Amino acid sequence: MLKLFLSTPRTLPNSRFLLLRRLQPLGLRYRSDASSLHLFTPTWRDHATNTIIKFVPQQVAYVVERMGRFSRILTPGVAFLAPIIDKIAYIHSLKERALEIPTQSAITLDNVSLGLDGVLYIQVYDPYKASYGVEDADYAISQLAQTTMRSEIGRLTLDHVLRERQSLNIHITDAINKAAESWGIRCLRHEIRDIRPPESVVMAMHQQVSAERQKRAEILESEGKRQAAINVAEGDKQAEILDSEGQKIKTINSALAEAQAIREKASATASGIAVLADSIKKQEHGLEAVSLYIAQQYITNFGKLAKASNSMIVPASTSDVSGMVAQALSIFKQVSKTTAPDKSTPKELHTDEK
């Protein structure tokens, strides 16, 4: 005949009290602290009573000993235990758990003392190793995380610790997994929660940040001035280029216009001379009229030059005006003789050809 193990509820809510009343007729013992206890803890030799029929919750493993030796592991569902000789020695939660790592001090590679704390996420994957491989798993994992964190911090400088927190977490997780493999515990991830450097270092970091911001502001200001100067220089350059292009075009157009005017003037002068020469040839006394015109122009222009105080004519005799006129007429006659066509030349050439 089975012995009923009844427990009197003390601080249970009404729902738990009703559940207790339902379990008592089955001869099962209900523990009020079963759902709130840290099931993944050291030894649980007095927290699971052999009630012959046992309902194992989901994601919970019961380690059963028979006569003091390991017998088996109960998986979720219903299980039957032999009275007296079977005993639930350990209870482990197979869920992921968060284990808080207390604050500790660590010294970086550049001799800066830091205050660190973190959170470690762990999970039992082998209840047998978790039961018999370590005495106090929580304490062992916490101490291992602290020593690993100090070791990893000692390899890095302060700047690397602040900048590479994610890689530091990965290194700590790998180191804990290697050490805790024989405990049946897996470290899923580690998170550094807070890094507290000394006050002097914090003040120096603030000054460095302020200096960096001031430096960036000055650099941006100088870059703005530089860009503005470049833009002004580029504008002046383009203006000079456009102005020179305009002056070039203006000079070319002016030269072309002047050349065209000279050509037109020369053409008009040549036409006038040709008409005048033709008229002189046709007139009976044309050469005498031209000689008279030259003499008049010579005397008139010489008189204008004589009035100018800053003009000098060398050689020239102002007392012998008639001689100068005669000289000018002599030159004209020689030029007219040289330019006059020789009508006998073609005949002589024709005779020579014969």
From Swiss-Prot:
GO cellular component: mitochondrial inner membrane; mitochondrion
UniProt entry tagged with the keyword Cytoplasm: no
Subcellular location: Mitochondrion
One BP term from GO: mitochondrial membrane organization
Keywords: Mitochondrion
Entry coiled-coil feature ranges: none
Chief site of localization: mitochondrion
Keyword match Mitochondrion: yes
One Pfam family named in its UniProt record: Band_7_C
Similarity comment: family membership: Belongs to the band 7/mec-2 family.
Protein name in the entry: Uncharacterized protein C16G5.07c
Species annotation: Schizosaccharomyces pombe (strain 972 / ATCC 24843)
Lineage of producing organism: Eukaryota, Fungi, Dikarya, Ascomycota, Taphrinomycotina
